Amino acid sequence: MGSIGSAYERELRSVLAGEIKGVRAVTKSCSEIERTQAMKVTNRPFLVVRAPGSGSEGTGDLLALRGDICFPIEVKSSKSKKLYLSGRTFDQLEALRDVGNRCGLLPLYAYRLKGVRGDSWRIMKVEVKGLSGKLRHLSRSIPSLPLTRNGKEYLDWDKGMPLHRFLSLVCRSDGAGTSVDSFPSSPITVSYTHLRAHETSLHLVC
């Protein structure tokens, strides 16, 4: 990917590692809600390792680890919303899938669209078999790489999960894979709802 690609790898690595400066940099043109969701990673950061071989052996460009969660991540960037995989890039995809199947990992693609305001990163998963635990639950909420009319996987920025939503998903305190769309809008709403439920149960007991 060259020096530009390496810069984007460092950008994503800084975010996943929970560095406040890095999160602020990628969310400076995002909404306050999006920024708040992304900032959750500062409380539950990943250990992020730059993988050797630039993803050619199924490790991806980055390896993000935390507890029982591990993501090999292949980083791509382009000025185009769609990126088709062929030759070496298709071999990288197949290697990621093979490692995911053999090791029970969930490989991801992180796609950076150049020249766009707001959240410029999108996350997509590589379809693998045999996932268990938290990875299996998380996998249900992360979109897969879309398919061409010939059934071949490719990258489509519009069909990926925004990075801030991904961070909010994987940084939930319980680690469950509930969709980000189902998150409560605010802590106050949750407290009020729980309080009303508690009051109702007391009335029923009485």
What residue ranges belong to the model's regions?
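Acidic-basic catalytic patches of nuclease active cores, encompassing PD-(D/E)XK
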Residues: 1-53
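Domain-level recognition of nuclease-like catalytic cores that cleave nucleotide substrates
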Residues: 3, 101, 106-175
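Active-site beta-strand-loop-beta-strand hairpin of nuclease catalytic cores
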Residues: 55-56, 60-72
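Residues immediately flanking
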Residues: 75
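Short, charged, amphipathic alpha-helix that recurs within catalytic cores of restriction-modification
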Residues: 78-117
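Polar low-complexity intrinsically disordered regions
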Residues: 175-180, 184
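Conserved small/polar residues in nucleotide/adenosyl-binding loops
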Residues: 193-200
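Hydrophobic alpha-helical segments, chiefly the membrane-spanning helices
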Residues: 205-206
